[in-house]
Amino acid sequence: MTVFKQIIDGLIDCEKVFENENFIAIKDRFPQAPVHLLIIPKKPIPRFQDIPGDEMILMAEAGKIVQELAAEFGIADGYRVVINNGAEGGQAVFHLHIHLLGGRPLGAIA
C-alpha cells in the first residue's frame, strides 16, 4: 500500500486542502516552492502511463482542480504543473499524483 493510499484511507495525517469523490489534494511535506500541493486521484493508478483511455477524463477533472487551487492559493498568474512518470521520470511514489508549484519565480525548463 502506497503512502498516498494510506493518506486517502486516513491512516496517515496530512494537511488536506481539497477533497471530492475522485481526488484529494494535500500540501507536500517537503515543499520545493512556497506553494507545493499534490493532487492525488483516489483510484490507485500507479503511473500516468497506466491511465486507461476510457478514464482519461480524470485528468480533465484534475486540471480543473489545479486551476481552482491555483486561484485559492494566489498563484493563478504563474505556476508549474508536474507529473513524474516512472522511475526514469523521477517518480518516487507509484500512485499517480500531480505537483502544483508556485509562489516564487520558477524559471524556465530547458
UniProtKB/Swiss-Prot annotation:
InterPro entries assigned: Histidine_triad_CS, Histidine_triad_HIT, HIT-like, HIT-like_sf
Residue span(s) of domain HIT? 3-110
Give residue numbers for sequence motif Histidine triad motif. Answer: 95-99
Mention one GO molecular function.
catalytic activity
Against Gene3D superfamilies, the record matches this protein to: HIT-like (3.30.428.10)
Query: Which positions are tagged coiled coil?
Result: none
Q: What is this protein called?
A: HIT-like protein CPn_0488/CP_0266/CPj0488/CpB0508
